[in-house]
Amino acid sequence: MIEVKNLSCSFSEGAFTKNKFTAVSPISAIFKNGGRYAIVGESGSGKTTLARMIAGLQRPDNGNVLIDGIAVYGRRRIAEKEHFKKVQIIQQNSASALDPKMTIGKSIEEPLSCFFHMEKAVRKKRCEELMALCNLPVDYYARLPSELSGGEQKRVAIARALAASPECLIFDEATNGFDLPLRKKIMEE
């Protein structure tokens, strides 16, 4: 279960000003295991900032996120590696999450090695399964992100996030541009 407690975040209006604008006003919510939730709002309403705070990528000004009762922020908090195993985010700009010098296969295999310590042959087999799930040809295994289209890079980011077998998967408009059958297939996984 993920609990958002009085979470808020603001950003500076510029390098030469002390003025700040509020990206996320204090918000509290509970997301139970097994549920599917949507955070909707207008452009600029703070959806991405909220998602990044839940994922542990953006420190809030106030409040906290609890994963199974353990804080994400503060002195007594969940270990970063454990957090990233439990919560994965696929961001709007998926290409920024990919190492430009790492092949697609190695990128997808990295969570399998880091979190599950799988043998190389087992990792490669699981990687190929995830690539098939995300409609990526197996011969993309040895390609670099720069050799793929934006949509293909997004599918690699999804396969990589699924490789961690997270309890919570956050899509920040990550399936935009995908056809309905592929969206459904990814959401079911």
Q: For each of these PLM feature ranges, what is it?
A:
Residues 158:
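Hydrophobic anchor residue at the start of the ABC signature
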Residues 122-139:
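Conserved ABC ATPase "signature" region
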Residues 169-172:
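Catalytic Walker B motif of ABC-type/P-loop ATPase nucleotide-binding domains
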Residues 18, 72-88, 106, 114:
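ABC ATPase NBD coupling module
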Residues 144-148, 152:
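Conserved ABC ATPase signature
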Residues 165:
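Conserved catalytic motifs of ABC-family nucleotide-binding domains
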Residues 55:
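Helix-to-loop junction immediately C-terminal to a conserved catalytic motif
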